[in-house]
Regions:
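A structural boundary/capping signal
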Residues: 5-290
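N-terminal secretory signal peptides
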Residues: 1-2
Length: 290
C-alpha cells in the first residue's frame, strides 16, 4: 500500500539521525507511524461548485475545466482531459519528496498539459505561442496558483500525502508540495525547458528556476542562497523571486544545489514534529558532508 511504503521510507530516513534525532521521542515516531498508515485516497477529491476548477466524469476519465487570472490580470480558460486509468495508476505509486520531484519532471501528462497551455488564448488576443516568454511564464504560474490550497489532512485524511501531477490536475487542489511539483512539471517540459528546483523552507516548499533560463524581464529578480536559482511561490501571488521570510534550508535541482546545515540543526525539531518535512531534509543531507 502506498501509505505503508511511505511509512517504511520515512522511518528509514528518520534513522539517519540528520535532523536532530535527539529531539524525537519514541512516542512521536509511533504517532507518525499510525497517522501515515491511515486511509489513502481512492477517488478524486470533491470539487466545490464555486471553485475556479470544474470536473466532469466521462466514460473513460475526467474532463477538467480550469479558469484563472494571472498577476497582470489576464483571464484564461483551459479544457483538459485525463484518463481514469492514468489517475488510478498515479495514485497507486508511492513517492517521497525527491522521487515526486523527478516524477513531475518526467510526467507525460505534464508534457501534454504544457502543449495544451501553449494553444490557450484570451478572447481578442493572440494565441499563447506568439506572446512574449515572460507572459507565457506568468500564465503557467497563474494556472498553478489557481488550484485551491488544502492541507493533506483536509483533502485526504492523512497528515502527509504526496500527489502526482495527474492527481493534482484531477483533484483540483493541493498543498505547497503538490503545487510545486505541478509547476516544476510544466516548466521542465520542452515548451520551456527550464532547469527547475524545489526549495525547502521550514514547513514550506516552493519552486525555483535557474536564473539563466528566465526571460530577460526577470534579470533583476533576487536569487536564492547559492546564487543559481530564483524562487517562485506556488500558493501565494508573490512576484517571481519573492518568497516568505523564512530561512532557506535546501535547494534541490540537479542534485543538491544548496543546503544550510546550521539552519537545519537550529530548526530541526520543527521538522520532526511535522512529518511533511523530515524525510526531505534527511534525503537532502544524506549525500552531503555534515
Amino acid at each position: 500500500m502506498k501509505r505503508r511504503e511511505l511509512l517504511d521510507n520515512a522511518l528509514d530516513r528518520a534513522a539517519l539521525g540528520v535532523v536532530v534525532s535527539s529531539a524525537v521521542e519514541l512516542s512521536d515516531l509511533w504517532s507518525v507511524a499510525l497517522s501515515l498508515s491511515a486511509s489513502e485516497p481512492t477517488r478524486p477529491t470533491p470539487i466545490d461548485a464555486e471553485d475556479s476548477i470544474s470536473r466532469e466524469r466521462t466514460a473513460d476519465g475526467y474532463a477538467m475545466t480550469y479558469e484563472w487570472t494571472d498577476r497582470p490580470g489576464r483571464k484564461w480558460c483551459l479544457e483538459f482531459s485525463i484518463e481514469r486509468s492514468a489517475y488510478r495508476e498515479a495514485a497507486d505509486k508511492a513517492h517521497g519528496y525527491l522521487s515526486g520531484f523527478e516524477a513531475a519532471k518526467a510526467s507525460s501528462h505534464a508534457e501534454r498539459l504544457t502543449e495544451a497551455l501553449a494553444d490557450v488564448s484570451v478572447t481578442g488576443e493572440r494565441a499563447w505561442r506568439s506572446l512574449p516568454e515572460s507572459v507565457r511564464l506568468e500564465r503557467a504560474i497563474g494556472f498553478v496558483r489557481s488550484f485551491k490550497y488544502v492541507t493533506d489532512a483536509e483533502s485526504t485524511g492523512a497528515p502527509e500525502y504526496i500527489r502526482t501531477v495527474e492527481e493534482t490536475l484531477v483533484d483540483g487542489c493541493g498543498d505547497c508540495e503538490d503545487l510545486t511539483y505541478l509547476l516544476v512539471g510544466i516548466l521542465s517540459q520542452p515548451a520551456f525547458s527550464y532547469r527547475t528546483a524545489m526549495v525547502i523552507l521550514p514547513g514550506h516548499m516552493l519552486a525555483a528556476v535557474h536564473r539563466d533560463d528566465l526571460p530577460a524581464a526577470y534579470a533583476d529578480a533576487p536569487t536564492l542562497p547559492g546564487g543559481a536559482y530564483v524562487a517562485i511561490e506556488c500558493t501565494t501571488s508573490r512576484p517571481i523571486g519573492d518568497f516568505q521570510d523564512e530561512p532557506v534550508l535546501a535547494v534541490y535541482g540537479d542534485g543538491i544545489e544548496y543546503i544550510d546545515q546550521s539552519s537545519i540543526t537550529d530548526t530541526g525539531w520543527r521538522f520532526v514534529q511535522d512529518p511533511t518535512q523530515f524525510q526531505t531534509i534527511a534525503d537532502a543531507s544524506e549525500g552531503r558532508p555534515h
